């Protein structure tokens, strides 16, 4: 799958490494700080982008790995037609993404992640999509990253 990452902090960095290890492709990285986006993009051979308008339509999944507080504001700026839009927060409802994409959900890592990790331990995920189709794709994607995947419900 082709993935866009929004964010460049701990969660985004570890997810980027996991995504590449699972033989998916991180195609773009966006961050409020372009230097941070460039640094993460370089690690995974992705393209850093300066604005959300530059996001490619070729990606399958767009992951918002930003602070919980930033999710609602960032979601308001996104209008994705076909992509699955995910956030990584356990305390934020998936429905905050409702107006940003018809296909949305949560990919929540049940473990603290640090970008400095040299070895990434097995990370359990809770997932929750807004439809059966999204849940099926999200489950396949999450299982490519981890053996420990469970469904959650808002």
Summary of predicted features, one role per range:
Residues 1, 83, 123:
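Nucleotide donor/acceptor-binding cores
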Residues 1-48:
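NAD(P)+-binding Rossmann beta1-loop-alpha1 motif at the extreme N-terminus of oxidoreductases
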Residues 3-6, 64, 127:
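Hydrophobic Val/Ile/Leu positions in short beta-strands of Rossmann-like dinucleotide-binding domains
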Residues 12, 37, 71, 135-138:
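A general structural signal for well-ordered alpha-helical segments in protein cores
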Residues 24-25, 83, 102, 147:
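Short phosphate-binding/catalytic loops that engage adenosine nucleotides
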Residues 34, 44, 48-118:
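Rossmann-like NAD(P)(H) cofactor-binding subdomain of soluble oxidoreductases
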Residues 35-39, 93-95, 132-136:
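Short, charged/polar "capping" segments at the starts of alpha-helices
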Residues 43, 119-154:
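Internal alpha-helical scaffold of NAD(P)-dependent oxidoreductase catalytic cores
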């Amino acid at each position: 799958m082709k993935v866009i990452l929004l964010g460049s902090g701990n969660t985004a960095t570890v997810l980027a490494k996991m995504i590449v290890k699972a033989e998916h492709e991180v195609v773009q990285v966006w961050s409020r700080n372009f230097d941070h986006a460039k640094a993460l993009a370089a690690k995974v051979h992705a393209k850093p982008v300066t604005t959300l308008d530059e996001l490619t339509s070729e990606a399958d999944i767009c992951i918002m790995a930003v602070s919980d507080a930033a999710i609602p504001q960032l979601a308001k700026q996104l209008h994705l037609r076909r992509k699955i839009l995910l956030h990584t927060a356990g305390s934020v409802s998936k429905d905050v993404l409702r107006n940003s994409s018809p296909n949305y959900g949560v990919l929540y890592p049940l473990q603290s992640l640090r970008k400095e990790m040299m070895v990434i331990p097995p990370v359990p995920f809770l997932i929750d999509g807004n439809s059966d189709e999204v849940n099926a794709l999200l489950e396949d994607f999450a299982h490519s990253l981890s053996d420990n995947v469970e469904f959650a419900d808002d």
